[in-house]
Amino acid sequence: MNIQRLREARHGYLKMAVAFLPIALLIGCNSAPTGTAPGLAGGQALTPGITNYPMAYVKQPVLTKNTNKKNKAATPDDIDVRDLITSITGSDLYVRNTASAATPEVNVTSSLTNGQGAVRDLDVSPDGTKVIFSLRLPLMENLANDDPKQPNWHIYQYDAASKTVTQLTNDDVTAGHDVGAHFLPDGRIIFASTRQLATQAILIDEGRPQYQAVTTDQQQAIFLLHVMNSDGTGMHQISFNTNHDFAPSILVNGQAVFSRWDTENGGEISLYITNPDGTAEQLYYGANSHATGSNIAGTSNNVIQFLNARQRADGQLLAIARPFLGTQLGGDIVVINAQNFVDIDQPSSPTSTVKGPGQMSATSLGVTTDANLPSPGGRFYSMYPLYDGTNRMLVSWAPCLIQGAGGTTEVCSNSNTTGANVVVAPPQYTVWIYDFDAGTLMPLLSAEQGTEIVEPVILQARKPVPAFIPDSSPSNAAQQTLVNNGVGILNISSVYDFDGVDTAKPDIATQANPGQASFYTRPARFVRIEKAVEIPPKTVRKLDQNDFGPAGMGMREILGYAPVQPDGSVSIQVPAQVPFTIDVLDGNARRITAQHTSWMSLQPGETKSCNGCHTTGNVTDPSHGRNGLTAAVNKGAPTTGSPFPGTYSALFANAGETMAQTLSRISCETGSALANLAEPYTQPCSQILTTDVIYPPVWTNSVTTPQPDASIDLYYGVSVVNGASTEGIPSTPPMIIGNCVPWSAQCRITIHYANPASNPADLFIQNLWTTARGPVVAGVATQTCTNCHNPVSLANQVQVPAGQIDLTSSASTVDPTIVTSYEDVLFQHDELTLNMGVLQDLTVTDPGPPPTQVPVMLAAPMAAGDAAASTAFLRMFDGTFHDPVLDHTGFLTSGELRLISEWLDIGGQYYNDPFVAPVAN
């Protein structure tokens, strides 16, 4: 897509300034660079209105290379946008009674910081009388800037009427970093915090100590959204993620828009929205719009992140677009039509006729987002839309500067920004007003040498005033029960609905009808709900990276399973206030769709509905996760009072209900135990998850359908179903946390590969290879997998392990922190040969040049993160493939195959509990 052409079409032309402003006016004559800056309007008076209101901003030192290596707390010359803790020492909050350079400025935080603290994240109350901000007290020199022993960030408030500063958050028993506060319409405050109040409470329920979970790169405690009263009381957590949720602001409809660092989805930062109580959280914009940043080469494919979004009075969204690092704390300002677009080229509605693109540069200055390269149009640190009807914004902007010969500073030009030795000079951000209608940038405040001014705001009432969204509360007894049980409801119309396309064979309606052959071959049979395990900081528990496995999926636990109904619908109760994801499974409990690459969460009593599934998550695929992007394919029951076509007559539907909703209404709301069905649910409500993988054939019986549906029963233990014994696992089941029979919101299924040293009796994958199996001699099973898959025979002779797979628990010769079997089943490994009684790597000649002997590498029999890709191994045991050397059919039970499958699908981790894994060195 030619973003430049689209931008020109929007603006008509790239409007340059009517005059050039000497940079000396910007930063002080005694340090004036040579040259002029483009796109600046000179000789103009301020538009009436802005000088009538107080103004607040942050003054901070210009960041330069840290030459004081002894001071570990010194501010670096650049800060990654994902680093929400590192502070710029020497920054303070300043206020002027009017927004004019002629009005004296007052440092209102100097008594707290003594010039050695830090201030950031300014926001103005809806009535324009208060400024809320983050402040960090002076750091200790002998500790790193983000060391947990350093002072925390806290939320403070400046009252313009009384001219007083009040601290709102403090270091109580739940202390953490508090940043990015924003006023809600009712006076409460939403902010990002590492306190993780609800998350830490759930850790106690899981039998773990309380700690502040860290990000997936284990660099910082996770910042998540919290809400508190105007005086700092009543603090509670409203967002749940495995990486940061931060920088909230309020839309005119009352919802909060915020930046989310997605864990899986490319690891980028996109915009999400939520109600102030945490309900209705969803993607808002940008998941597939990251490779759209302008660059100095004239194209628009730099990878950018969407930060610090604020809504203009006209409803358009402003955001800072910049890469993670390398653009001197600044970037471009983009205007986003988020009301009509979810991505730059994807409308938010399938019927939308609004022309795109969904975003474009807010100015015509020619700002680029190349890391470590000059930006001809300078860079923006922050923006603040003015709500005075003038279509302007207050910005902190720095012109493009480079280091010239002899240490001089020069304004960028076509002649001095080319070549391999261009050195970008430190930015010098000051305050400007950008007029969208005129396309001009006008100076407002300058700064002395070595100082910059950022985050300017005007203490003016916001117009229109954002709507107030009250916190949700239970509307009936059923919803109150959900709240009491700590769960919400997830409804999926059909897992065969892929981005609005019916992928069922031949279609959903036919496949859902027991009178059709496709009913009995439907591929999607279950969903598995997985939870991310909160990783503690290294000060609490130091982990080895091998513990997480090779799939890069972190540690995970299984919350439970539920059947997919014949129309592909699902209606389930999910634990509230935990990040969870969904896998769609076949009858063997193996994932059949692409891995779901984002986390969801529910509040207690909340019901969240989605149409179906989505494609692989590549940037070429459409975004998902925002309501209304596609129309639902599954329209539900056509009429009220009749069963679905061909199904059991007792399950009568209401018009528009999916099969899952009908089943849950009858079993959960009316209290029916479904006793007349062929195989009753083991729990009274069909929405409740189970630890076992069970499908009761509720939609058919011998009266209505000549061919009844088959049940599926994959148990951990041996059970009796319909009079027949099922094969589970002939030992103890996986580690179970919380109440799982009957299921509760605290239920967790934890699977490890290695022997959990804390509780060796718990089942682990390695145990499968040493479990005794048939044939039975004198009442005792005599065979184990390690009898053959072992470098030493039962006669104590050296041998090549059967199938070149060593399943013993000896230390791996490649990495002694893991056992050999883990190495051989999940990683490519050397083929072995027996040479004169000694095992050696088999080698072949690589012709080169020069010719060399290289080992023969064998593919891993299993794939971490994908049980379906491990089918060649798994089918040797279920009778669908017979090994010509030794038939393995029945060597592993159906329950054991299910255990291996789910362990592979969730990531093939070595451990899935940080407190079971040994402490790393």
Language-model features: where?
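Aromatic- and Gly/Pro-enriched helix-to-coil junctions and flexible linker segments
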Residues: 37-38, 42-45, 50-52, 88, ...
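Beta-rich catalytic cores
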Residues: 51, 89, 118-120, 127, ...
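Short, conserved, GDST-rich strand-edge loop motifs in beta-rich repeat architectures
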Residues: 58-88, 134-152, 191-220, 258-271, ...
